């Protein structure tokens, strides 16, 4: 039971997105169609199977989040995917579990979120601590948790895996699975989606991160913007996870 909240334009790309969501049973009541506004479009250019460039077509507007926000409490978990384009002014969202993929440098905008999932670049911009190794990652995350009352930070380290830091000195390092010639398009979205569904079910951050790690490895083994199924993740875990 998934719902999507956001904006699209009244154009062919918006229609394609709505059609894709409908075909997968996603509730689209929370999507506003804005007249004379282009649907954000990302066009990726590949050479020899590797992405070499990306062209973005977009227009930033002032948008007031619609009525769906009032119903967030009806859902087990809310994923806030922030691209720092002005739509999200702050993360004061009354969700049962709020998990944030941050883009803004000021993590205080996400205060009280349960989990945030920055990559190394995003983490470095949010802290004055020089990120150079796992020890500095833990120090930076611990400081940000203390300042912003997060339950956990899942720091994404690319092909080096993840570091999970929580309150009360909780620290876990998860090694990434090796994938030959990976396509990392959408890998972060796969991580936060898998992490969210697992955490909503188990409330076990380490187990959820392992599940997300396997989901990401499955996704990046496919070309382009790929999705993964529960069966694919379970098969990957059976043959690869320790």
Predicted regions and their residues:
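Structured core elements
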Residues: 3-4, 42-44, 54, 79, ...
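Active-site proximal loops enriched in glycine and acidic residues that flank catalytic Cys/His/Asp
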Residues: 6, 82-84, 102-104, 120, ...
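Residues that scaffold the ATP/ADP-binding catalytic core of kinase and kinase-like folds
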Residues: 55, 126-127, 165, 219, ...
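Conserved phosphate/ATP/ADP-binding segment of small-molecule kinases
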Residues: 83-85, 90-171
């Amino acid at each position: 039971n998934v719902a999507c909240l956001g904006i699209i334009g009244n154009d062919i790309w918006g229609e394609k997105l709505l059609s894709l969501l409908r075909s997968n049973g996603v509730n689209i009541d929370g999507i506003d169609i804005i007249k004379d506004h282009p649907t954000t479009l990302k066009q990726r250019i590949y050479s020899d199977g590797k992405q070499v460039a990306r062209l973005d077509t977009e227009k930033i507007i002032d948008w007031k989040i619609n009525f769906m926000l009032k119903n967030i409490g009806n859902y087990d978990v809310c994923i806030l995917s922030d691209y720092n384009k002005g739509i999200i002014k702050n993360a004061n969202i009354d969700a049962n579990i709020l998990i944030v993929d941050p883009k803004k440098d000021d993590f205080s905008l996400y205060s009280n979120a349960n989990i945030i999932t920055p990559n190394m670049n995003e983490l470095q911009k949010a802290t004055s601590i020089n990120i150079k190794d796992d020890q500095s990652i833990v120090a930076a995350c611990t400081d940000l948790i203390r300042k912003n009352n997060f339950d956990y930070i899942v720091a994404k380290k690319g092909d080096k895996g993840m570091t999970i830091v929580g309150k009360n000195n909780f620290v876990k390092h998860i090694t990434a699975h090796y994938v030959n010639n990976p396509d990392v398009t959408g890998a972060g979205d796969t991580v936060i989606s898998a992490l969210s569904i697992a955490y909503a079910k188990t409330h076990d951050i380490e187990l959820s991160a392992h599940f997300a790690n396997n989901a990401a490895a499955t996704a990046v083994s496919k070309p382009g913007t790929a999705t993964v199924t529960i069966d694919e993740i379970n098969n990957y875990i059976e043959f690869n996870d320790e």
